[in-house]
């Protein structure tokens, strides 16, 4: 079970590589805010940055499947004025929508869900807090092959590992 308010890594079910906000560890003068979420698939030993799940029903101690929740990047290193809450926004840089930070707690546009996907799980984005929701998958952008989380027809199968300490 995934516990509310406890940090977890979101990992692709077939890899140890996780997700982290783009540019989080770069020189702060080069930051472009808000920070889009990238995969660390090219760096399989990097498990990314943990997140905290907060269900819409804040009295729940366990995060339920197929219910609205906010995803909050759990990092002490943060240089952007925007929030650490995940949302989906259009990106001129990437030519489509991407999962990014800067969402608003408990508001439309920042709702995601965890759903079963075979033997794994998947994330879906529910912009209105109800259906239709869209699967979150991988979008490869540019010659450098950066892989961003984005609404896609093909979901990324994921698993969750509790962050230690």
UniProtKB/Swiss-Prot annotation:
The keyword ATP-binding does not apply. GO terms for molecular function: carbohydrate binding; serine-type endopeptidase inhibitor activity; toxin activity. Hemagglutinating activity is stable between 30 and 60 degrees Celsius. Disulfide bonds join 33-80, 126-133. Glycans are attached at residues 27, 57. SMART domains: STI. It comes from the Eukaryota. Keywords: Disulfide bond, Glycoprotein, Hemagglutinin, Lectin, Protease inhibitor, Serine protease inhibitor, Toxin. InterPro entries: Kunitz_inhibitor_STI-like_sf, Prot_inh_Kunz-lg. Dimer. Glucose and N-acetylglucosamine binding lectin. Has hemagglutinating activity against human and rabbit erythrocytes which does not require divalent cations. Inhibits factor Xa and, to a lesser extent, trypsin. Does not inhibit neutrophil elastase, human plasma kallikrein, papain, human plasmin, porcine pancreatic kallikrein and bovin chymotrypsin. Has insecticidal activity against the termite species N.corniger. Induces apoptosis in prostrate cancer cell lines DU145 and PC3. Belongs to the protease inhibitor I3 (leguminous Kunitz-type inhibitor) family. This is Bark lectin isoform 2.
């Amino acid at each position: 079970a995934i516990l509310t308010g406890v940090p977890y890594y979101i990992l692709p079910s077939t890899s140890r590589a996780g997700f982290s906000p783009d540019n989080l560890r770069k020189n702060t003068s080069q930051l472009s805010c808000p920070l889009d979420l990238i995969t660390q698939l090219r760096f399989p030993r990097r498990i990314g940055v943990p997140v905290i799940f907060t269900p819409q029903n804040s009295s729940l101690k366990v995060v339920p499947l197929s219910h609205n929740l906010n995803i909050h990047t759990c990092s002490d290193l943060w240089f952007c004025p925007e929030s650490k809450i995940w949302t989906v926004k259009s990106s001129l840089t990437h030519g489509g929508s991407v999962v990014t930070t800067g969402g608003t707690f408990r508001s439309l546009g920042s709702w995601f869900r965890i759903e079963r996907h075979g033997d794994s799980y998947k994330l879906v984005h529910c912009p209105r807090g109800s259906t239709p929701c869209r699967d979150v998958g991988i979008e490869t952008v540019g010659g450098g092959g950066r892989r961003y989380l984005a609404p896609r027809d093909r979901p990324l199968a994921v698993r969750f590992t509790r962050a230690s300490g």
